[in-house]
């Protein structure tokens, strides 16, 4: 490709409304342009990267035995009514009516459509197992689209759905998809971690997320320092204390604490060890019989709402009770709450169950109890894992301790079981002629999100540093003053021809432009390898080569450059 015949569209200035580096660089590099909130057009450079990501995803899915199909983005509402998600999904589901007043949605996901398709097309166990995938546009009406392609309303996704009659083949397909996702991200040259994850609104049993590691990642990953164990912070298991509860050494006493509205203030004013304090959080209960529930964690720990959501007593999704409700039921406000004398159900974290001589609110404004001990002062409450893990704690496999990293979720695989097939009556006849409900798996990759995540992991102060496999161009040719030198023009044109014939994606900057601008554009759009051609190089019989990632420069003899670049591009 010649720059003179290409829509390069680079920008010097960083757009004011772009918060994260991938959004900034995708705009500056001329990859995307905003049409409306969360909606973008891909320009040629962006589309080249997107198509390369898409190609790798497609190749690995095909290798894993999945079969490509294509389903409509517009979906009839009655399918969503069947599964109950018409009411449950919320405002992210964009709903509309056609000219005949029939309800439709813009698909944020395709479980309903694929299940409807399979129940009509598959009738016998002989047709199973089956794994179908598509690469299709999705739409989620995010309340606040931000971060460019990291959280846009319209995005490109690969979603696959598998169908089974037995758990064994479902497990085999799940493992195949796990390996395929690992291969996809490895081929793209990205540092990533597969992590245990919560199934979220889609539902199901086993689930893994695939995270590209980046400091800007929205998700916190807890991983083992001594094994492959890793989990989303929402899913990471807290260790059950092995040490017995300490004996009581203090008397229970009621203390005036008028200026201690938070744990931090309490600890500072009374010189307490924060691990000897607890936080009492009041959430909405799951039934009229238990309208409020108290969740108690240690003062230095944080409540894990995903874990709390799974408690039978707690309403789903977890909702913090209002101060008015709390005062009406307990008689005190947040900041003065604790377990003694509490007239609502209590669930405490494992770490709280082994505490002794601890401090908590007295359920009277501006008062706390110090020296609280279980059994002596109150019975031990229901115990559960309801907190986030912290660095340094032992991991559940016993092979290391927790460390933390930030990640960007780009893939998610689920074992759905019968969540959708049962509600939609998707059945087949088994070997005995008996009707059986299908087991399902679901496997998603954010194709357009990978593009942004790759940038978040690969950039410097000059621009993007693309991994080889997904770069828009592998080689950039920079001829110095080619419009004034026939020698430079001839050699640049010959190299351009040779690289094209070798099947290497090459961009020739044939503009009448200053060298500084040419260099800046090549580095901004992240071309991995650049070759500089000038009269001085020609006189010396060498090309000047520069590696974008390392910054290394080399003089390569004319007759060796083509082989050198072929090897460099292969990595």
From Swiss-Prot:
Catalytic activity: tRNA(Pro) + L-proline + ATP = L-prolyl-tRNA(Pro) + AMP + diphosphate
Keyword Aminoacyl-tRNA synthetase carried by entry: yes
Localization, UniProt: Cytoplasm
EC class name: ligase
Gene Ontology cellular component annotations, sorted alphabetically: cytosol
Entry keywords, A to Z: Aminoacyl-tRNA synthetase, ATP-binding, Cytoplasm, Ligase, Nucleotide-binding, Protein biosynthesis
Any one GO biological process: prolyl-tRNA aminoacylation
Its job: Catalyzes the attachment of proline to tRNA(Pro) in a two-step reaction: proline is first activated by ATP to form Pro-AMP and then transferred to the acceptor end of tRNA(Pro). As ProRS can inadvertently accommodate and process non-cognate amino acids such as alanine and cysteine, to avoid such errors it has two additional distinct editing activities against alanine. One activity is designated as 'pretransfer' editing and involves the tRNA(Pro)-independent hydrolysis of activated Ala-AMP.
Name the record gives this protein: Proline--tRNA ligase
Organism, scientific name: Shewanella baltica (strain OS185)
